[in-house]
Amino acid sequence: MTEQVNLGGAWRMREADSQTWHSAHVPGSVYADLMADGTMPDPFWRENELDAFERMKKDYVYQRTFTVTEAQLAHAHVELVCEGLDTLAHVSLNGREIAFADNMHITWVWDVKEQLHAGENTLEIRFDSPILYCAKKAEEAPGWESSDATPGFRHLRKAHCMFGWDWGPRLPDAGIWRPIFLRTWDTARLENALMLQAHHDGVVDVTIRPEIAGESAWSAEITAPDGEVLTLPETTAAEQVIAIQNPQLWWPNGLGKQPLYRVTVRLATGDTRVWRIGLRTMTVSREKDEWGEEFCHVVNGMKVFAMGADYIPEDNILARVTPERTRHLLEDCKAANFNAIRVWGGGYYPDDAFYDICDELGLMVWQDLMYACAFYDLTPDFERSIRVETHQNVARLRHHASLALICGNNEMEMFMAGANSALINHRTWEFVPTYPHHITDYVKMFEYILPAIVKETAPQTYWWPASPSSGGNFDAPNDENRGDNHYWDVWHGEKPFTEYRKFFFRYASEFGFQSFPCLKSVEQFTLPDDRNIFSRVMERHQRNQAANGKILSYLSQTFRYPNSFDDLLYASQLMQAEAIRYGVEHWRRNRGRCMGAIIWQLNDIWPVASWASIDYYGRWKALHYAAKRFFAPVMISAEEEGELSQNPKINEYHPAPLEKSFRLNVCNETLRDVTGEVVWALRTPDGEIVRQNQQTLTIPAMSAKWLDKVDCADASLTGHYVSFAFVVDNVAVSEGTCIFCAPKHFEFIDPRLTVETHGDTIIVTSHAYAKQVWLESEDADLLLDDNAFDMNPGTKVVRVVRGSAEKVRGRSVWDLGR
């Protein structure tokens, strides 16, 4: 039977060239330990990042003692298991170096029986400076990599974004970042198990194939969500099959429940492991069609429109990431009607808790392997390392119901093919000559080695070579009509929001727009004098080149200029929400042709101006509230024609009269037909109805339905707006508004917003049309069931989800510039 001795907890740590020891905690990191004992201030405060970066130009030593008994040494196998060493680690036992680790993403295992003795033993791990290592490698073997990061990062199997990104600081921490322990066993050890599913009418056959080090008989059982237990007898066979009658199927969020079955495998020698699985089929359809080739998730035979965002590491200081914090973030995804999440390839493979929570919440996981924005040298050592890394991580993740596909890398095929020159030009990538071996190495890695490992390790998990891609082999990897797409002409290309409507991507896996965090968040990393977007500290917390200028450029196109720093932050969030709304609503209206909208990005790694919908401190931006509406299972939206779509620069000559019209569409991303009333009204700024209409509409399951275009030639360009809603059983399940000009030119009148609070209920009253009403507490954090919403004259009831409703104030677009 396998036994473990935990080696985590209290350690000590020092700079390699110093004899001054600091107390340390494992799992943890150098930065976390230096902050804990007061040696280093928080690197997220103001410009402290610079000092923290300099500290990582040194080597660090971790040390602890532990006791081993004669009984433990009597086992046939005594192993040191390190589930995460970050990254260049020399491991010594009792004064003798026994191993060197150089991959953060690997679980390292060494047999140490001969190096241990009964009594007290000393374990020491020395971490080489990742900065100095990468600098040396960058000189020795140059090659293309993201210029936002420290040069040479591509040579090290370490989370790339720790070296900096266009949303993250340069804080390449080091340390023992995951559990470390001694493991003893004798004749057999249960390493893992492969579970395969075969679905038939009313039955799912589950094949269980244990992976055993050594030899042992084994048995298994499956416990259903209702407690029913199905057993498999003890056997020495390689696999057994168990039939589950009347299976409870796992569905993505919004389409059904997420029942999980518990699989227990036991060895006769005593080892036992438990996994949770969901019964479902999950693949990707690439059927040819009239537009090219579709790309969509297919779950239990149903084609699903993916709605979600791209996930990056939650913190540069990895010790701060906890299962509770991750659950909070992912529950906020479900609250915003996500059914999917993409784990971006420039970070690290998340902990098991991440995938467990996605299983529970119904979030389909697009899992990148950890390669991003760089060309790699496939040396023999590198190949050996990535083979182990890929097998280990895929084997760890493969049983999860939420695992939708495994993708080879982020943006490497696109950059190597030069498929998107607009993106490259606007991103300020600094290209170096592409060496021929980089192309051949890429093909070997992502079209032969890695897909073969994934197929062998997780034969029922879909493989996709890169993001974006049309299927590999450098065949137009950002093609609008095939595969997945990264679209950045809105933002990097500074195109207007309406530009999204020109494209019908089969699956948009990246598109985004920046905003600043709210004032409460800015106050947590700045001094009062820093609170100007062009201050040194605010620019330090803005890592995308020229981004603040882009925000102001878009602001000039959209709103009146704000009168305060707080209003500027607010305006940036409103623009972000509007930009992404334009894209998502357009693609959902074209369901069938378009089958995925994954927003860049969900979260922040530190306090920063970025594309995130939830900031570093967990506060929802306006975008996340908007996502809750435009990702709603049943959603009404308008494709309006007006000045923004035809003549956004009002002084340019436009020979034809501007079309003023709108066309409504209702999307139904549920497994049942939905019948309701579509109601709309053309209104003046005070809410007075000029004309209106109502009609009954049935939208079939998993579809989108257009209504006829409504001509508004008689409407005032700047003095009329349209309100619309889809009403089911007298409840407006989705609603919105549209105008025919930029908000800055609309003839808003003071809505005279009033806010009343009654416990966890907030009643908002508006006396005129109010656009993007924002409610916030002056003192406390506040999460609401709706925010940044449009209002006709009247009242709206908003519920408090988290926080206190005391001292709540409201504002809207009317307040900007006044």
Roles of regions detected by a PLM:
Residues 1-340, 589-590, 594, 619, ...:
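Secreted/periplasmic carbohydrate-active enzymes, especially glycoside hydrolases
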Residues 5, 13-19, 25, 171-175, ...:
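Substrate-binding clefts and catalytic carboxylate motifs of secreted carbohydrate-active enzymes
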Residues 100-113, 120, 131, 135, ...:
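Acidic/aromatic-lined carbohydrate-recognition and catalytic surfaces
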Residues 104, 166-169, 251-252, 310-323, ...:
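The substrate-binding groove and active-site-proximal loops of carbohydrate-active enzymes
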Residues 304, 334-341, 359-364, 399-405, ...:
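Loop/turn elements at helix/coil->beta-strand transitions in domains of secreted/extracellular proteins
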Residues 307-309, 341-343, 365-367, 408, ...:
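Hydrophobic faces of well-ordered beta-strands that scaffold small-molecule active sites
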Residues 340-386, 477-494:
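Aromatic-lined substrate-binding rim segments of carbohydrate-active enzymes
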Residues 360, 377-472:
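Active-site neighborhood of glycoside hydrolase catalytic domains
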